[in-house]
A protein has these predicted regions:
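Short S/T/G/P-rich N-terminal loop/turn motif that feeds into the first structured element of a domain
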Residues: 1-56, 60-70, 74, 93-95
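C-terminal end-helix/capping segment
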Residues: 82-95
Length: 95
């Protein structure tokens, strides 16, 4: 069953964050990951939304998503994200 990695971010260093954007997708592909929503303006329907960006990536299973998150391929992009943005990541099951 497909799962979704959802990340909410506030960019602190837009110049260096471009390196993250360039490297993250290649790190996901080996694990069957792909973006289904990435960046762009967020249209808040209710309440407060604390972050300026939302990213949703689809993986074929929770195991593949966790393998990617802990993988050597994602190590450099993860370090870039942590250095250039405040973020939260969760995994949710698809239906």
């Amino acid at each position: 069953m497909a799962v979704y990695v959802i990340a909410s971010l506030t960019i602190k260093d837009a110049v260096r964050f471009e390196d993250y954007k360039r490297t993250v997708l290649p790190s996901m592909e080996k694990y069957g990951g792909r973006f289904v929503a990435r960046g762009g303006p967020i249209d808040v329907l209710e309440g407060e939304w604390p972050r300026e960006r939302l990213i949703i990536a689809e993986f074929p299973s929770i195991e593949r998503a966790r393998e990617w998150w802990g993988s050597p391929e994602y190590a450099e992009p993860k370090a870039l994200r942590l250095a250039t943005a405040d973020s939260e990541l969760v995994i949710v099951q698809g239906v």
